[in-house]
Amino acid sequence: MRIIFSIALFLTALHAAAQKIENIIVVTTDGLRWQEVYGGMDSAIANNKKFHKGDSTYIFKQYWAATAEERRQKLLPFTWSTVAAKGQLYGNRKYGNFVNNANPYWFSYPGYSEIMTGYADTSINSNSYKPNPHVTVLEFLNQQQKLKGKVAAFGAWEAFNRILNEE
């Protein structure tokens, strides 16, 4: 039985290694809580008058369901029907899947710099920081002969030009 299992495991690994990866897409979000990604609508927030215009009925009608799985599908349908089905999601703290940065700051530029360079730099301590002094993984890949000119980035925040050294 062990031999059959080992052969099956080897063939599975061989098949996985033979698949050619065409693209790598990294999607990050800023300010999105993991609780909503994995649990859907948070009733405490929906009931809080600071977050609605006096009537939360519409919010509950649109996004509430009996289970976390149903609620998250209602709140983030593309994430759960496409991204989770065809890619990978990380950061469900309920199951100990912590995706933390190593830097001591809890704001954007230092975190994105760490994601893109692979290490924390405590001198990057402001969202107004100058262009990133470090080579990002995207820059490194673009310097490789086979990938030159095939690396792209999109960011909806002006600081990404500095973080990714596009200025």
Stretches with model-predicted labels:
Residues M1-I21:
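Bacterial Sec-dependent N-terminal signal peptides
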Residues I4, G31, W157-F160:
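Short, internal active-site loops enriched in acidic
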Residues I7-L11, A44, T122:
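A broad, structure-centric signal for solvent-exposed, well-ordered loop/edge residues
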Residues L14, N47-N48, H52, P104, ...:
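Alpha-helix boundary/interfacial micro-motifs
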Residues Q19-G87:
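Active-site-proximal N-terminal segment of extracellular/periplasmic enzymes that hydrolyze or transfer
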Residues Y63-E167:
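Active-site-proximal alpha/beta segments of enzymes that process anionic O-linked groups
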